Amino acid sequence: MTQPVRRPSARVVIVNWRQAELTIRAARSIREQLGDGDGLVVVDNASGDGSTERLRREGLTVVESSENRGFGAGVNLGALGMKEEVLVLLNNDAVAEPGFLEALLAALSNPPSAVAPAAATARILLAGRWKPAAPGQPDALVSPRTGRWTRLDDQAAARGEGEVLVNSTGNLVDASGNGYDRDWLVPAEREHSPSEVFGLCGGACAIRREAWQALGGFREDLFMYYEDTDLSWRLRERGWRVIYVREAVARHEHASSSGTESPMFIRVNTRNRILTAAAHSPAPVVMQALARTLVRTLRGPQRGPVMSGLAQASAGLPRELYRRMRGSSSSQ
């Protein structure tokens, strides 16, 4: 008789920065799904606004960082000393639907191998309901695949108008080194993507402890954005699989923790895209990443932040190339 698959234990890590109420909502959604041997850790990235006190009043285990060193460093801090078998990440502006944790853990019931996946990425849906945006509407979300969308108000959503849209079914990388969410803004009822995917989305995912520790966790110098793309590259370079688990559903308030049109987002995203391409991609992809950035600088309205990101990436390129050469020589 076939033995039932044992459910691995999990440590869930949520990173907070000055968003205590959002973080509490996320924690409540996942806390009720925890089993024996599981843990939930909230890392506060030096919010300095009373967040830690509010989180502790909720009964949450809070680890305080002495300074805000970014998302990746926050996750690494929350995973320190981990004894649980699987690390689960949930953005503080996301909500895990019932069955989310069980589905992710079922996909990672065995240690990573050529057959068993090392990591699993969830089905992340955008919160609310959406309709096609009117021409020129400034606050629309844009997808080259499905067009421009705007969020309906709560009353229209309650009437069932509009569409539920996908935020991510995993991470992909294009020919210019751009990491992006698979199925971004695809209506959920039309999403039927395969389980095999290049990488994970750090907003709602899980990774086996063996893989996490072997890779040393997230890169901390990226601060925020592209940590998941970089980690996905490193998983692939080890020959480890990442799979998409449709049954693990989270709903995400897109960009409620950091605006995607802010100068900071554009600068950091530009820098990290180029540095991640330099760290992992073939030379033509790195050149494409640089060329794309130059074109965006000349044509786009965000010249200042793009130029700043390009300058920071250029300063970091020698370090990335040195690391890459050193890694290649040590593997021979």
Regions found by a protein language model. Name each.
Residues 29, 44-52, 67, 97:
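A conserved acidic beta->alpha catalytic loop
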Residues 50, 72, 94-107:
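Acidic donor-binding/catalytic loop of UDP-sugar-dependent glycosyltransferases
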Residues 65-82, 92-94, 170:
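Glycine-rich, basic loop-to-helix element that forms the pyrophosphate-binding segment
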Residues 99-167, 171-178:
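Conserved donor NDP-sugar-binding/catalytic core segment of glycosyltransferases
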Residues 196-249:
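A short, conserved alpha-helix in the catalytic core of glycosyltransferases
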Residues 285-332:
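Non-catalytic, C-terminal membrane-associated alpha-helical segments of glycosyltransferases
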